[in-house]
Amino acid sequence: MNKWVEAQKWEKDWWSDCRNTVWEDVKQMNLAPYLGLKIVPNEHTNYRIPLNGEKVLDIGGGPSSLLLKCENVQGVVVDPCDYPEWVEERYKACGIEYLPIKGEDMGYENEFDEVWIYNVLQHVKKPKKIIENALRAGKIIRIFEWINIGVSKGHPHSFTKEQLEEWLGGKGKVIKLSGGGLYGQAFHGVFLGKDYDSKAER
């Protein structure tokens, strides 16, 4: 069994039957501001991210993507892990397309307004390829990834700030976190995609 297959099995076992994802959802909302996303509570929930109709690709979004907490979004989740069938059905019911494929196998070319990558690169087979595909797929890339964590059975990769900046072609920020389910050094930032055109935003 190669390291990636072993890591996928670990990930599937970690999620179990996916019925109770509350703690993961809380962690997501705590990291959302580091992606540059604004949480705007209303009378119904404190966990709400209003968007403006953007088309967003979430790479490795898992069974409970941040897109499920967003309003007014055209979402696509790409994740190869073997989750229960109802995970895809829930995404469909919420108007989110779910593709059980590897991020390395994506072939998108400037099809998205935004690409989101959060807490995923340490799990994948070829992290640099994921970044390359993300830069081709969207106008901007929002990223939050742990750095300097070492490798383990479920996390076959570890990264440095310099490594991620080189792949992304820009400067990010590093913060040390110790609460709300977020522990360790994290790299985060918003980066321009390969075909970003500032004139198109005017």
What are these regions (language model features)?
Residues 1-50:
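Class I SAM-dependent methyltransferase Rossmann-like catalytic core
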Residues 53-62:
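Conserved class I S-adenosyl-L-methionine
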Residues 61-105:
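Class I SAM-dependent methyltransferase SAM/SAH-binding core
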Residues 116:
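A conserved beta-strand element that flanks and buttresses the S-adenosyl-L-methionine
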Residues 119-120:
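Short catalytic micro-motifs in class I SAM-dependent methyltransferases
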Residues 123-134:
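A short, conserved alpha-helix within the catalytic core of class I
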Residues 138-148:
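Conserved beta-strand signature within the Rossmann-like core of class I S-adenosyl-L-methionine
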Residues 155-180:
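Short alpha-helix
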